[in-house]
Amino acid sequence: MGSQPPPPGSPLSREEGEAPPLVPAEEGRRRSRRVRLRGSCRHRPSLLSRRELASNGPAVPATASSEIMASAAKEFKMDNFSPKAGTSKLQQTVPADASPDSKCPICLDRFDNVSYLDRCLHKFCFRCVQEWSKNKAECPLCKQPFDSIFHSVRAEDDFKEYVLRPSYNGSFTNPEVRRFRYRTTMTRERSASLYSPSSTVSRRTTTPPDSGVLFEGLGISTRPRDVDIPQFMRQMALRGPTTTDERSLRKIQEQDIINFRRTLYRAGVRVRSIEDGGRYRDISAEFFRRNPACLHRLVPWLKRELTVLFGAHGSLVNIVQHIIMSNVTRYDLESQAFVSDLRPFLLNRTEHFIHEFISFARSPFNMAAFDQHANYDCPPSSEEGSRSDSSVITISPDEAETQELDMNASTVRQAPWDDETPGPSYSSSEQVHVGVSSLLNSSDSSDEELVSGGTTSQIQGVQTNDDVNNDSDSSSDNCVIVGFVKPLAERTPELVELSSDSEELGPYEKVETVKTQEQEQSYSSGDSDVSRASSPRSVLGKDEQMSKSHCDSDTRISSKKEEKRSTSLPAPRDSSSTRGDRVCSPYNHRHRKGGRSRSSDSRSQSRSGHDPRNHRKHGKKRLRNKRSRSRESSSRPRARKDKKRSRTRDSSWSRRSQTLSLSSGSTSRSRSRSSDHGKRRSRSRNRDRYYLRNNYGSKYKWEYTYYSRNKDRDGYESSYRRRTLSRAHYSRQSSSPEFRIQSFSERTNARKKNHSERKYYYYERRRSRSVSSNRSRTTSAGPDRVRNEKPGGKRKYKTRHLEGTSEEAQPAREFTSKGKDSHYQKSKLDGSYKNESDSFSDSRSSDRETKHKRRRRRTRSLSVEIVYEGKATDTSKHHKKKKKKHKKKHKKHHGDNTSRSPVVITIDSDSDGESEVKAGIECSNGSLPQPIQDGAFETKDVVTIEDELGVLDKDCDVTALADDLSTSQTVENCDSPAVPVEQTLDVREESTFASDLESQSSNVSIQAEPSRPVPSPRTSLSSVSPGRDCDVS
């Protein structure tokens, strides 16, 4: 061990073969043997040399720790350990072949402050053995427990003793220390405590003498405990759902669980289903053979169940458990062999036990989680009348199915929270379906809309409709989805629809157009009076054909729209309009298949396919080339856009109320009021995105988008003809009225341009609606205006542009006929927009347009009776002009369209909001190739619209080139709702409205008698339509 010779008598000297000191051999061997036994280790500490042992003599047998430490100190000196406490190191390098005693057994490095254990005297580094003792107070070498450590040994009487604290003494040898074991680990103590009669009686049974359910069944100790099952059911039903949230059944005392399980066995209540989320385990015998570890989870459950069955008979529990665990790997749990082995023990409870055992074995849960997710089905065995509710432990939504069989009412009551159960399973009748559908719809969109007042009656009314019943059949076998109203936040996709103009969507667009039309109609019928009433009533009253199909589709759609509207629209509704409200809700149409019904409606009613959306689509491509034909055919593509813009509302209403008679002035007016409100709302909803609300919140250039509802045009042509008196705005959009007219249909072609114009159109129309609503004392005027102002952002932008062009508002008529026809017709019903956008209103008229636009928007209804009452006191005349632009184009390409006779309707609206509709129908067949010059009609009250493309005079005069006026028609006092008219509303600020109603190829000249003249230099709009002239007075 280095160059320095080890001291004589040291262990190393002996190992190197040096002669030991002279001592009595026998005594030395005896003492060393004692030390060896004491160390009980092959590598005993060589602290005591033979010489030391000899010197100690007989004192060794009673060696004390002090003596040992003294000898150890001597040995340290001989081994050249440093005398410094805590830093003693071997001063010389330990050779590679040094004895294991020369290194610390724990760190396998040189000793650092050599220390000795009090019992075995094994040497370790003090720090190493100290840390070791914190974990286990056992010698790492001999595994003997120790209580103290001797360290810092300098001399026999100079050392330190480190006494272990009791906390560190946690070795297995200490009987006071209890080792951690899993609850499923069976130890003697546990087996004794679990199966001893005393412990079993105290812990596992209800009462000390409990003998188990089996023995109760045999009559040994029968206790009628079935009476308690309702109480247990209620208790567990209350605990079950809460445990899934926060609590666990562990908090429920074992006794309660045992009692509950015992009660279930007594009553024969079995687990019906497990809320396992579709997960399950393999329980085949082969699986258990391959995976014996999976058997462990079965043990706790088996012990509990067998304890429930056998009670205090612990021996039976052990025997049956052993049999079960042995057979699980032999037979399948469902096999007859497995059951037959248990029948001698379980007797009449065998099937029940096997059912419960298989349910638990299949489930992916442990015992506690299984109890939480288990659904129990109580048979009607006891006197439990209340068990229908309490018998089934509702712990999971799956139990709804369980309860379904027990009680329909309870299942229906659970419908709101049970999402997994389909609607039809809840309802047993139509009304129930309706209620459930309303609940489902309300959950999908907003409960408020469907639950709002009158919704239930509306839903029922809709059910009465055949179309609604058809929808219910189509949507689901039993459930009628009356309305599907999505939140406003989820309705933005309509913008996307507006942008999409492809003709490929023809039928789809048509459907969407119908939806949008109805939606817009509901809003353009704003108060949902027009849209709803006109769809179910006015359509029925005016066009029974259209009303039939339309009412059907409207009814379905109205159910949705009306539901939404019932909440959204404060405006008063007629009972029929109330139905229509749902129908008219544009969002409902969009989201519902009601749009399809409307599209079918539109298809049936508009043979030419004037669907505004389709017309828009075709209008884009063909409007430039085929104005008249695009009016018809492109009404489909446009219709889609119109739908997007809620123009389809008007068009659908127009086609529905094509025969709608303006004579029903008050009805139309109330409708227009309500439709104004609805329009504005729908527009505000649909066009919030389009309207730029600028600083013109106060200053709206009212523009009336005229819904010319021409029966010939199927109401699709009833497009919003927004006439902006401020021609400058339109000028920038399109210099010529023809272009504007085209732009309506071209909007499909020029999406960008159409989009901006559309925005402006929406804005102006919105403003005009708001203005008209302000002026028209319609019940919906207030909310409508609010709605109009809602999208005011874009509208403001548009208005700013309008104001920039013209601050002064020219007569509302000029503005309306010009601006709306040109720009908004394009946006609403491009096909219908053909001619009227020729003239623009002055700046003043544009300002008024803004106002009228809001009103217009509000008044936008199926029979676009602009309840524009100029001033509240003034009698405003609603002039409805058919969209000649679309007709004009369509006429160019289709002469047959011109064959339809134009209808002119003059509407007088009192300050009360009632407008008398006077329509003079004068049909003269003759071609009038008479172009109308700019400013041909400068009369404030007279607006002439011709189908030919007209050029808007910048002085707000409309020049229309008459291509061929084969027919001129003047409609006077047309009260019958059956009169097919495409209504374009020309509104004046002075509450003067001119409406031109013309067939697809008819020219309408509207002369409005204002309650007071409009202070506009020119209010004449001339448009030329091939083959027909319509003069309206």
UniProtKB/Swiss-Prot annotation:
Keywords: DNA damage, Isopeptide bond, Metal-binding, Nucleus, Phosphoprotein, Transferase, Ubl conjugation, Ubl conjugation pathway, Zinc, Zinc-finger. Residues 613-629, 637-647, 721-730, 851-860, 877-894 have a biased composition (Basic residues). There is a cross-link at residue 561 (Glycyl lysine isopeptide (Lys-Gly) (interchain with G-Cter in SUMO)). It is found in: Nucleus; Nucleus, PML body. Induction: By genotoxic agents such as cisplatin and camptothecin. Residues 434-444, 465-477, 522-535, 654-669, 770-780 have a biased composition (Low complexity). Its main location: nucleus. Residues 1-36, 414-477, 496-692, 713-934, 970-1033 are annotated as: Disordered. GO terms for molecular function: antigen binding; DNA binding; DNA topoisomerase binding; SUMO transferase activity; ubiquitin protein ligase activity; ubiquitin-protein transferase activity; zinc ion binding. Residues 1-10 have a biased composition (Pro residues). Residues 851-914 are annotated as: Interaction with UBE2I. A zinc finger (RING-type) spans 104-143. It catalyses: S-ubiquitinyl-[E2 ubiquitin-conjugating enzyme]-L-cysteine + [acceptor protein]-L-lysine = [E2 ubiquitin-conjugating enzyme]-L-cysteine + N(6)-ubiquitinyl-[acceptor protein]-L-lysine. Residues 438-654 are annotated as: Interaction with SUMO1. GO terms for biological process: DNA damage response; intrinsic apoptotic signaling pathway in response to DNA damage; intrinsic apoptotic signaling pathway in response to DNA damage by p53 class mediator; maintenance of protein location in nucleus; positive regulation of DNA-templated transcription; proteasome-mediated ubiquitin-dependent protein catabolic process; protein K48-linked ubiquitination; protein localization to nucleus. One of its GO terms (cellular component) is spindle pole. The modification Phosphoserine is found at residues 99, 196, 500, 585, 718, 734, 861, 863, 909, 911, 999, 1016, 1025. Interacts with TOP1. Interacts with the SUMO1 conjugating enzyme UBE2I. Interacts with SUMO1. Interacts with NKX3-1; polyubiquitinates NKX3-1 and induces its proteasomal degradation. Interacts with SIN3A; sumoylates SIN3A. Interacts with IKBKE; induced by DNA damage. Interacts with p53/TP53. Interacts with PARK7/DJ-1. Functions as an E3 ubiquitin-protein ligase and as a E3 SUMO1-protein ligase. Probable tumor suppressor involved in cell growth, cell proliferation and apoptosis that regulates p53/TP53 stability through ubiquitin-dependent degradation. May regulate chromatin modification through sumoylation of several chromatin modification-associated proteins. May be involved in DNA-damage-induced cell death through IKBKE sumoylation. This is E3 ubiquitin-protein ligase Topors.
